[in-house]
Amino acid sequence: MSTPSAPETPPLPYTPAYPIRTERLDLRPVTPDDFAAIHAYQRRPEVCRYLYWGPLDEAASRASVAAKAARTTLRESGDLLQLAVVVRDSGTLVGDVTFVWKSSAHRQGGIGYVFHPDHAGRGYATEASRALLELGFEELRLHRIQAELDGRNTASARLLERLGMRREGHLRENEFLDGEWADEVVYAMLAREWRAQREERARQR
């Protein structure tokens, strides 16, 4: 009996067709003109409380924007897409999202997100993150997509659960952040779980 082969992923390099459009949002490459909007939340301590960086001063934020602007194409494992999230009707940049190509061999990806708190409660982070899952599972045909977060970041955990991701791991005191030990929590979704969720959404329409 032959062993079934894993579905092929798209050949690298891979560049999405920009903008990635959702019901209300455009996910597009970051540009230098986005500095003011991105720095407006990167400098805020409450935004960076559970992240691996920040708050950022203007120089650090300009460097961050420049790095994000260069991350528009996936070429090899470890590469990132870092995209501005813009409300289509108003043109307002409300945050940015990250898609990580973790492993070609194992068809693994990852997602991340940072949003301005002034725009919280409107579902933008959930909508943009779901677009990244769709990119990973539908376009790139990945098998598994995960997200890691500080164990104290309950708002982020709720977002991932709304997406249908499962809590897979809790690493105790795994990171030393801002002068204290912090737990790390891992959420993930498999391709078959995404397909089941997609079919359920279709039935509810």
Stretches with model-predicted labels:
Residues 146-148, 166-184:
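Conserved catalytic-core motifs of GNAT/GCN5-like acyltransferases
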Residues 113-115, 121-138, 154-162:
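Conserved acetyl-CoA-binding loop-helix of GNAT-fold acetyltransferases
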Residues 138, 144-147:
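Short, basic (Lys/Arg/His-rich) helix/loop patches that form interaction surfaces
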Residues 93, 97, 149-159:
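Membrane-interacting alpha-helical segments
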Residues 1-118, 135, 139, 180-205:
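GNAT-family acyltransferases
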Residues 91, 123, 153, 179:
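Conserved G/P- and acidic residue-centered "switch" motifs that form tight phosphate/ATP-binding loops
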